Each structure stands twice: as C-alpha cells, then as structure tokens.
Amino acid sequence: MAVDFSMRQLLEAGAHFGHQSHRWNPKMQPYIFGTRNNIHIIDLAQTVPALHAALQAVSDTVARGGRVLFVGTKRQAADSIAEAAKRSAQYYVNSRWLGGMLTNWKTISGSIQRLRKVDETLEGGAVGLTKKERLMLTREKDKLEKALGGIKDMGGVPDLLFVIDTNKEQLAIKEAQRLGIPVAAIVDTNCNPDGISYIVPANDDAGRAIALYCDLIARAAIEGIGRGQGALGLDVGASEEPTAEELPPANDDVAVSVASDAIAPADVAALAESTEHFEQLAAPRGAPDDLTKLNGVGPQLVQKLNDAGVWHYWQIAAMQPEDVAKLDADLKLNGRFARDGWVEQSRAFVEASAA
C-alpha cells in the first residue's frame, strides 16, 4: 500500500512557504505559484505528485534490498532525520558531512572500524588504561559517534539519498552525483534543482514541515521492507521482530489543489499559521507583527526576539511554559515573558485578528 498524505497536511505544516522573493533561485520559477507579502508561495499542486514520486523511489529502493541515506545537518532537521532513519532501519548523517563520505568510502570504513574498536574497549571496562586514557578514549568515541554513528552499520555506499536543504548539503549531493547515486531532495525557492533526481519543491526550514517529510520517507522505507520480505516469501508474522506497520490516519483528508476554489490563495498563510506548537523561524512569514505592542517591548527587544526566530504573535501565543523558560533564559530576559504577560497578550492579539 502506498504511503498516503494530503495537500492539507502540507499546507498546515507550512510546506508552501518559500523564501523572500529577492532571495530566490530563478531555476525554481516553474514551481512557484505566486508571491504574497514578498514571500514566494510554492505550487503544492506540483509538490504533491513530486513527493509521491520520491516516496515511491524510496519504497522501491528498500524493497529490492537497497540502502537509503537520510542527510540533514541543519539544526531544525537533525533530530527528525535521525529519528526517521532509525525508525525505518536506514542510515543518516545529521551532524556534519565529512568530505569523501561517499567518494572515499575506504577511508570512512577505516574510521568506522576505529569507532567499533573504541566501543569494544570501553564496553570491556577499558582494563589497563589510566583514568586520563579512558577519558581521551571516551572523547574520541563521542566525536566518532557524532560524525559516523548514523552510517556505522551501512556496510557500503547507499543506493539513494534523501536530502533536506540542497544548499547546505551541496557536498553530499555532488558526491552522490559523481557516483551515480540518485538523490531525492526537498528543494526550496532559494535552491538550485539541477542534478536532483527527485525534486520535491517545498519549504526546507519549518520544523513541522521537515518532521512531516521525514515521517513520510520513513513510512515509505518501512513499506519497502515489507514488500521486500513478501517478495522473498518470508512469514513476517512468524518473525521474532516483525517489521513495524504504519497505521492509516484516522481521518484521510482529501487532497486539494492550491489552484482550485477549495482553498483561496489568501487563506494559504492563515492555514499554516494555525500551529499548536512553538516554532522559531529563519524569516518572517509575510510581514512581521508589531511586537512593540507587547508590554514593555521596544525596538531593541524586538531585534532580540527576531534574532531568536520570533516575528509573529501567533508564535508567542503557541508557547508552552517550557518554551517560555528556554527563550527567556536564552535571551536573558529575567522572567519578563511571564511577568509582563506576553503570551496572554499575544493570544489576545491573535484572537482579535481572527474575529
């Protein structure tokens, strides 16, 4: 069964928001629906079939015994990349792409062997080593694990790459192209789509969107594992560790076209802004809100909040106590979020604007 998703899911995750219109790559022109508040809007009518094609490629690759390497080293992608790869028994790089990870696999394999040897030494109690030597060995292990932990069991170069942010992961893509490895990638409006085998035009910065892409790719890989085992005649139910089966969503949303009358272009931004979780943004979605309307907030504090990825009332309104505590500590605000009631004020502003 193919992995299902709807255009509404993409809209709610903010997948249609590109970058500011002056930061675009002209090669992405065919995938742009229009411009709203100087922000390019991606044509999700093209994203949906493109994402379906990428999911099918992942499923087919895994079904025939191939390996999929998830690549996403930016902060907002790292956790989703690792979680999705582990859940689907695939491989990942989420820290830093080391030059030659694909094209110089022999050297990388040597580093992986070193990681395994260090692991064995530490697990065996590091007998005969001084405290300083054990500490140095632990630090070496941590460094190697961070760089190579996601590929230490890969056993060879992958058969397909799934990439978040083609600008940041240019080196990985170039190495894959050199070896003829197909690449499925999320390509934003400021990216170059050249050389990408499966172009998925979509936002590559929003945390919710990245989590959605990774979840779908993981589900496609899991489906591929099931298909592969079925083709081999294996009794999956008799296995001691049967393959995880993804349950269908409780309510299947009907896919709609951005160009149709079902969702007006003016409502696109409002749909994406109905978030239940606090999300920091690399840039404002449309025009930023006037945060000086919050109690005691002046231009300097607005700049601080913007630098921390906060541009809109709806972001602050979605903050939970733990989000408030973290941001307050990061910006050294000494409890002003709670003391001045910024979250409550922001919720009031959001409700007033929706009325």
Curated annotation (Swiss-Prot):
GO molecular function, one term: structural constituent of ribosome
Record-linked Pfam families: Ribosomal_S2 (PF00318)
InterPro entries assigned to the protein according to its UniProt record, in alphabetical order: Ribosomal_uS2, Ribosomal_uS2_bac/mit/plastid, Ribosomal_uS2_CS, Ribosomal_uS2_flav_dom_sf
Signal sequence region: none
Cellular component aspect of the GO annotation: cytosolic small ribosomal subunit
Biological process, per Gene Ontology: translation
Keyword Cell cycle: no
Keyword annotations: Ribonucleoprotein, Ribosomal protein
Keyword flag Hydrolase: no
Record-stated family: Belongs to the universal ribosomal protein uS2 family.
Record-given protein name: Small ribosomal subunit protein uS2
